[in-house]
Amino acid sequence: MVVGGTGGKAGDPKGYFYPLGFTFVSKMFARVTFLPSLAYNCAMERVSARQWWDRIEPRVILGAIPFRSDWMALNLGMNMTTEQMVEMEGVRGVVSMNEDYELQLMGMQQEAWKKLGVKFLQLENTDIFSAPTQAKLRTGVDFMKEVVESGSSVYVHCKAGRTRSATLVAAYLMAEQGLGPEEAVARMREARPHILLHSPQWAALKEFHKGVNQQNRERIS
């Protein structure tokens, strides 16, 4: 399932605003830097304490992109195949914040996940300069909640598992545990210290938090 396009585009009242034309530039920058930055992430996994994925909650996993190729998975950071990860971690749902080209290059797409018995949701978002729209955050949180309540684990990823996917997991923590944006990010960093959010992601989380608070007030009244 693919929902919408890229969040944070100019004129989107639910995204972080940038001048017209910036979206195109940011998309091109993300494409050009995709492979170099992925190589950096693979190297950091080998020379530092970083893990390819970390459990943020008992049934919520935040991580980097699962590779389609067994060779890449075994040699570039995952240290096991994606199929092995699914079985070992009990993953039955995956949310990808990647754009199509990222998954087409080396990631797992819907049919590949289906063969492993895993539900898949793609919420496309450009890396670094944009944040998921509020609609995408709500859709992602609902999907995560459904998987968790079924007793299985959900794996949320982007390229490195530190910005786009971290934004969604933070929204989930706010919705399910009543945390504020700063508290949610601090909770994630306890398990995954290299999480990195920029102004657009913080703005999206603050907007989402307002929505959660409004819903809570409406339930009480």
Short names for language-model regions:
Residues 161:
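Conserved G/P- and acidic residue-centered "switch" motifs that form tight phosphate/ATP-binding loops
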Residues 43-156, 171-216:
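Cysteine-based protein phosphatase catalytic domain of the PTP/DSP
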